[in-house]
Structures are given as C-alpha cells and as structure tokens.
Amino acid sequence: MQRLLFTPLTAFLGSPCLRLLVPRVAPRTQCGCSCGIRRPLRPGQYSTISDVALQPGRSTVSLPSKAAERVVGRWLLVCSGTVAGAVILGGVTRLTESGLSMVDWHLIKEMKPPTSKEEWEAEFQKYQQFPEFKILNHDMTLAEFKFIWYMEYSHRMWGRLVGLAYILPAAYFWKKGWLTRGLKGRVLALCGLVCFQGLLGWYMVKSGLEEKPDSHDIPRVSQYRLAAHLGSALVLYCASLWTSLSLLLPQHKLTETRQLLRLRRFAHGTAGLVFLTALSGAFVAGLDAGLVYNSFPKMGESWIPEDLFTFSPLLRNVFENPTMVQFDHRVLGIASVTAVTVLYFLSRRIPLPRRTKIAATTLLALAYTQVGLGISTLLMYVPTPLAATHQSGSLALLSVALWLMNELRRVPK
C-alpha cells in the first residue's frame, strides 16, 4: 500500500523540471525525524519559487516567478506583433478601398468564405445594394469584387486571431497562477480592449455603408470612426509592448539627476508626439488628404495655402478640411523629427548604458527614414506599397520611442 501511495510522488518530485523547486534535504523536526511537523524554513530556502508554488490543495506547481514573468512577457510581445500586423493589414485594406466589400458582420458565420459561384453571386448582389458600388464601382466585375472581398476578409480573420492570441493564453496563465495581482488587471484591460476594438471596427464600416445626404458624395467611412479604430489599436499595441518590455528587459539602476529627469520627461513627450502624428494619419487616410497637395516643402505655390479655413465653424477645418488635415500632418511630422533630434543630443550629454544609447540612435535613424517615406509617398501620389511602408514606419518609430522610455524608467526602491 505504501508503495502505491508514494512511488508516483517520488517519480514526480524527481523530474528534472522540479528539482530546483524543492529543498535538497527534507526539513526535519527538532528530534531529527521526518514527521509531519516541520521546522520553519531558512530565509532564501525557496527563493526561486513564486509565492503560489506548492501551496496546499494545488494540483500543479507554478513556475519560478522570474520564469513566469519571461513567459508572460514573451506572450505579450507576440500579441503586440499580431496587433501590429492587424494595423498594417488594415492600412492596406483602406488603401485598396476594400473595407466596404463585406456589408454585414457575423462573429462565426462569416468565417467561412463563399465557395461556389452561386454563393459569390449572392455576396456580390448584397454589395451592389450599397453606395460604393452604385457611385464608384458600378462597372466592377465579379473577379474584381473577389479581390477586395478577400482583402477585407483577411483583415477580419486576422482580428479574430488577435482576439484568440490574447484571450486563450490569458485564461491559461490566470489558471496556472503565473499572473501577479498587477498583471491580472492589465491583462483584463487588454482583453477588454481587444473585444472593444472588434466592435469599433464594425461601427466604423457601418458609416461607409450609409446613404449620404448628397447622392453624389464619395462613399467612405467616417474619418472620426477611422481615427478611433486606429487610436484604440495603437493604445492596445503600446500597452502590450510596454508591459512586455517591462517584464523582459532588466531595469537599469540609473543615478537620479536633474539631467536624467529632464531627459525622461522629454522622452515621454516625444513618444506622445509620435503617437499623435500617427493618429493624424488616420484623418489623412479617411479624407484622402494625401492627394490634395502633392508637393514639398510648399503646398502648391505657397507655404500656407489659402483654403485652410474654408469650413465654418473654424474647428471643423481641423478634422474635415483635407487641406488643413494634410497641413496638420506635415507640421506634426516635422515637430516629431525635431523632437527626436533634440532627444538624441540630450541623451549624448548623459552617461547612459549601451542599450539605452542604441535605442536613442535607432529612434533618430527611424525618424528621418519615416520623414523620407512620407515625403516620397506625397510626391508620388500615394502609391499603395509606399503608403503601406510609411504606415508601418510609424509603428516602428512608436515602438522604439516606447523602448527608449522603458530604458529610462525609474527603478522602484
């Protein structure tokens, strides 16, 4: 009977993955025997085990806390990569004017694409009932419709993949006890934001399917909803990447000086400016403002075009006037690259770790590359490959800005 009870336990504790999680010598009582009452453990005896490891009543053994942090950090890094992919694919979908090809939304039903000719004809007939076909694409063939349909379908399926990448591992890590109390709150917020993002995407598409007051208005999604959709995706991306970097990268113990504090604050402001510039790109895309003035540095024949304030009230121009929207994006882009340049030279005046210097240098190089891509996209009348690369560059620039912020973060005492 003893053999049946204790042999599996011995084999379990003898596995290589658990040898570091238990003491080499079993704790004994004062009398030297191995009875049920144990002496208090010496400090550090279980220093590699998380606070939930080997608790009574648990059927599993938790990973060491540092190992669990690395696993969770890598998971969030992968998640941020999937969000970046969704943003890039969504940008290409917008550039190819494919976003309004799927005129309804079903969480499960639409996962199966049409297969027969009859199903494709039925899908095409649904599309023909909406303004985009009637005004812009009335001579579209079925083959052309299939292309834009598959573009939107790919974006939607990728969005579902993003949801699974967040929710399923989150549930697993929660059950295993690998999430600290602080991480649990963050992970819940991230999963909630993923679900909100999906609903916001359909809310955006609906705006492009509605009949406009003027029957000759170009069908397009609301630039406000497009900016909200992109903005929430960027927030999700930044939050995931920041948490991942905080878990994976060891913190630098930097000497807190006035110069370091100023550099840290300036890095935060620069990252915010980069975020705002990327967000303004949604208004440029939503209004096709990149096709208004295709010259640089001037806009047409002047530095400040005359049609900046054609709408009334004046505030409407900031969000609805294509000329003003392009002008704002130019100004924000120039302000961003200027801020990155100043940040780089400020970082050179302070003794910083090598990894932090690499982040600052990479940020500078990416900023000027992004400006070059933006100017080229403008001068070449927004070709899809170049415009998609420019959008991807904004994500790369934002990522490195977050990396530099993470390098400069204050170490808690």
Swiss-Prot record:
The keyword Transmembrane appears for this protein: yes
E.C. number: 1.17.99.9
Chemical reaction(s) catalysed: Fe(II)-heme o + 2 A + H2O = Fe(II)-heme a + 2 AH2
Listed pathway(s): Porphyrin-containing compound metabolism; heme A biosynthesis; heme A from heme O: step 1/1
Residue intervals on the Mitochondrial matrix side: 1-70, 175-186, 251-271, 348-362, 406-413
Pfam families to which the protein is assigned, alphabetical: COX15-CtaA (PF02628)
Reported cofactor(s): heme b
Domain notes: The N-half (TM1-TM4) and C-half (TM5-TM8) domains are connected by an intracellular loop. Each domain is formed from four-helix bundles and they align in a pseudo twofold symmetry manner. The N-half domain is the substrate heme O binding domain and the C-half domain is the cofactor heme B binding domain.
Protein name: Heme A synthase COX15
Upper classification of the organism: Eukaryota, Metazoa, Chordata, Craniata, Vertebrata
